[in-house]
Each structure stands twice: as C-alpha cells, then as structure tokens.
Regions:
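Eukaryotic N-terminal low-complexity, Ser/Thr- and Lys/Arg-rich leader segments
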Residues: 1, 40-46, 90-115, 143-145, ...
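N-terminal Rossmann NAD(P)H-binding glycine-rich loop of SDR-like oxidoreductase domains
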Residues: 1-25
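Structural motif
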Residues: 2, 72-73, 151
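Conserved beta-strand positions in the Rossmann-like core of class I SAM-dependent methyltransferases
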Residues: 4, 28, 196
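Oxidoreductase cofactor-interface core, primarily capturing Rossmann-like NAD(P)-dependent enzymes
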Residues: 8-11, 15-16, 146, 150, ...
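Conserved glycine-rich Rossmann-like NAD(P)H-binding loop of the short-chain dehydrogenase/reductase
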Residues: 25-32, 36
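NAD(P)H-binding glycine-rich loop region in Rossmannoid oxidoreductase-like domains
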Residues: 36-132, 136
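A short helix-coil junction within the Rossmann-fold of NAD(P)-dependent oxidoreductases
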Residues: 136-149
Length: 316
C-alpha cells in the first residue's frame, strides 16, 4: 500500500502518517512547505525518516500529478476552522483561536478580497482543495492496474462549532462531501474511487497539543452525561446515522447541542480510523465519531477513554 497524504506534516496528517508507517505502508506527504513533521519542541520522531516529504499545492497539479498513478490511496487533511491565522507549527493554540474567533465575531478580518483573504477562504481551503484533489486522483486511476476502487479520504468534521465558528465552515465541508460522493457515484457500476469522509469531533493530544486536554476532558464528561439521558428527552435528537453525505446544515442550536453530546477524540484514534477505513474495502461514505469508535473497539454506551487515560486501539 502506497499512501499519499496532503498535509502529512500537520496535527492530523502526522497522526495518519505515523499509523500508516506502523502498518508497513509506503507514505508520501505533500504540503505547502514540504518540511518533515517535528514536535512542538522541535524533535523528529523515528517514523519521520520512513516518510517521503514533498512540497506541493492542491491547486498546482504539476507539483503532484506524476506522483498520483503510483499511489493506492489519497488522504487530504487540508482545511481551516477559521479564515484568520490561528495555528503555530500546524497546531491550533488557544490564544490564537480566541483572537481569530474575536476577529470573526467583530468582522475585523481585513479585506476579504485581498490575496491572503482569498487563499484562506473556507470555499478555497475546505471545499475547492478537496474537489481539485479528487478530480486529479480520479483521473490518475486510468494509469493504474487497480482491481478495486481506490480510497480517497477527506478529513471533514462533526458539526459542533457553530455558532462560535461561521456556518460557512461546516457548509463548505458538507458541500465537498456531497460533490465528491456524487462524482464517485457517477462511475457506477464500475467505480474507480471509493470516497470516505472522516468526521472527527474535538481532537486532542496531551503531548503535541497540551491545551487541548482540558476542553477534551470537559466534553468527555458532558458526552457521558448526555448518554444517560433518554433519547426521547433530547431537545435536539441526533439524526439517524447515514453513510451518505447531505449538504443540508441543521440550525446552529443543533450544532451547539452536538458539541456537548459527541465525545472528543484522540488524534491518534483518528489516524488509526483513517488507516482502517482505507484497509477495509467495505468502508465508504461518512465515518463519524460513533463509527470510528465502533471500528476501533471503544465501548458504545459510555464512550469510554477519558483524555489521558488508558491505551486502546493503538491510542497513546
């Protein structure tokens, strides 16, 4: 298995790369800088030397077109939670996030028509980059000898951040899912690409992103309490689970309710779930937190695994 990861040196992408290397897969990372992953302290883990690090952009086909025919699967982790800068070394920092949220709330984001504003827009980073990569990967399948549909994994998100984050964030994610699904379905009855939409909730890691642990612990507690409430008493019942994406976005109140109902997830668990989805030819469509926990063997009722406790399904 040869896996291409766009954004493999970021918070999520590095977790996927590490899990893929552990499986013995060949991994190539394509990112804007082309730099290998490094911890916040500047350390380079041993697995980093097993990955090929390349510089490229989803909007510049010449930077990766020759690579795709040799890849069995592609994962894109590209996207942005906010249209103003909020990451340091690829990891969201609390103060930077709060500053960006304030700028979004007050509308002081600068000129949206400026070059940097256009390049950081939700439409470009969350939707168009994924569509561009899907089309390129789909076109490359004619040059392969694959006997089954090749996995294309889009790292999407659970709808848990509204009204704190603009609705366009999740809308562009859902638009990308829907358009990719429809494009892949158009190849029936002989599809060449198997789309998978992984939807993590709040992702945390005690060491790579220590500030994420406190909110994760709190949300773990609220999700456990929510699980004890009879479904009939939920103010905003969760929609029936479906693997087919839907571009419709529910009211913001439903998103806020989901924030307290859906447990956070360790970024390494997301990495493992992505690799499991690639390896399982039956997995396609939406893979939400509940489905990830199911495939990784987490307990279904209490959601289990509070941040920083225990090791399960390769989570450390």
């Amino acid at each position: 298995m040869k896996l291409c990861i766009f954004g493999g040196n970021g918070f999520v992408g590095s977790a996927i790369a590490r899990k893929a290397v552990a499986r013995g897969w060949s991994v190539v990372s394509v990112s804007r800088s082309g730099r290998p992953f490094a911890t916040p302290a500047g350390h380079s883990p041993a697995w980093v030397s097993e990955v090929e690090w390349r510089k490229g952009s989803p909007f510049d086909l010449s930077t990766y077109d020759a690579l795709l025919p040799s890849c069995d699967a592609l994962v894109t982790t590209l996207g942005t939670l906010l249209e103003t800068p909020y990451k340091e070394q690829g990891v969201a920092r609390p103060l930077s996030v709060l500053k960006a949220l304030a700028e979004n709330a007050t509308g002081s984001r600068g000129n949206p028509l400026a070059k940097d504003g256009r390049e950081r827009s939700y439409e470009r980073l969350n939707r168009d980059s994924a569509l561009q990569l899907f089309e390129a990967f789909h076109s490359s399948r004619s040059s392969t000898a694959a006997t089954s549909p090749s996995p294309f994994v889009f790292i999407s998100a659970e709808d848990i951040f509204r009204p704190f984050v603009p609705a366009r964030y999740i809308q562009t994610k859902r638009d990308a899912e829907t358009q990719i699904w429809q494009r892949a379905a158009a190849d029936a009855p002989a599809p060449t690409v198997r789309p998978v939409f992984v939807r993590p909730s709040l992702m945390y890691h005690p060491h790579l992103n220590p500030p994420s642990t406190l909110p994760a612990t709190l949300l773990e507690a609220t999700s456990n309490l929510h699980a004890l409430i009879p479904r009939a008493l939920h103010l905003f019942p969760s929609p029936p689970p479906s693997t087919i994406p839907n571009a419709a976005v529910p009211p913001a109140a439903a998103s806020l309710a989901a924030l307290f109902a859906i447990p956070p997830i360790h970024v390494d668990a997301v990495g493992e779930a992505v690799c499991a989805s690639i390896a399982d030819e039956q997995t396609q469509g939406v893979v939400d937190v509940a489905r990830m926990r199911e495939m990784l063997g987490f307990d279904a009722l209490g959601w289990g695994l509070a941040p920083g406790r225990g090791r399960k399904a390769g989570v450390v």
